[in-house]
């Protein structure tokens, strides 16, 4: 029964901003994940200008017992962070914690459901 012992963590990764209010939508996504699954282990992390960073967020989940961590990049487009920085950071996490199963979701902007939702919002009159 290995599955019962497995603790899965989710890191919602966003760009980051010095403006504290900028984080509110990211934190709202985390709150929604928890509403849908109160047992979820979800944290927010930021590429720059805000804390925690990805390494610190992963370290916190691992300290809490996570054996698998899924990183969900909350980016609309495949910019430099998603294309270059994130793969390097994920590689560093895998090297720092080889016992943890890290996975990377595709950027949310590539998810058909989000594209459809944004189109519906844009088309509202």
Cite the ranges covered by each PLM segment.
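Active-site-proximal alpha-helix that buttresses catalytic centers in soluble enzyme cores
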Residues: 1-125
